Amino acid sequence: VGNSIKLKPRYYRWHVDPGVEWVEKNTGYANLNWDIPLSQVALVSVDVWDRHYITDTEARGEQVIQEKILPLIAACRKGGLEIIHAPAPGRNLAQSNPAYVNLVTSEEVNAGRDKEWPPQEFRGKSGQYEAYARPVEPRDKERADRVADLVMHPQVQPEGDEVVVAFGEDLHRYCKSKGILFLIYMGFNTNACILLRDYGTVEMSKRGYEIIMLRDCTTGMESFETHDDLWQTRGAILFLEMFGKYSIKSDELMAAL
């Protein structure tokens, strides 16, 4: 096991070269050369579930897990790269896991939120605000039943000293205690939890961490318009690369270990 890893993280230059017209088609990708102390890096596994209620989303995710995530996890364990598991807190899956770090209370997590405004009725679209609610989906109970006993993927479980976090503040306090500055992300879904969780790429970038997305260790929630070319997935990764974050592929990380 080496003391550092050499990576060439990719980003998107919203710039043009000297002498070139300022138009979008003249912008493009670029790479940096980083030599990162191994002790300052962690792999964050976001919401790697055992299923999804949309069948093709589930199939893509399972293929990513089997072909990309599992080999990467094995390489990281062998190479000494820390792995942090971040399942969603909603079902208490993180909090009930024996590996949960338990560094923050739910009261602390909610402390900064204004509970009075917007009013609870407005948030819940009830009472005088009921007219603004989306219609009830006729198959929503069926959807809920399909994921009622959702769990962390059986092949992507914490081992040894690997920890589980439930909240962004958990992740931050743990990283602070370990001196971790670089967070490499994998998991699901690219355009949802990877972007929007408080332990996800955007919020942890706001806290000052360097963020690297593993672009072949994820897939997004596609629409009928984006499904064929996976433009939700690709667009979410490009969003990160355009706005201060980076990406690599799993084989690059494995080769660096």
Regions found by a protein language model. Give the residues of each.
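Aromatic-lined carbohydrate-recognition surfaces of secreted/lumenal glycan-active proteins
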Residues: 86
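Short acidic, Gly/Ser-rich segments with clustered Asp/Glu that frequently serve as metal-coordination loops
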Residues: 49-54
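Active-/binding-site microenvironments in catalytic and ligand-binding cores
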Residues: 83
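Active-site-adjacent betaalpha module
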Residues: 1-42, 55, 59-61, 70-71, ...
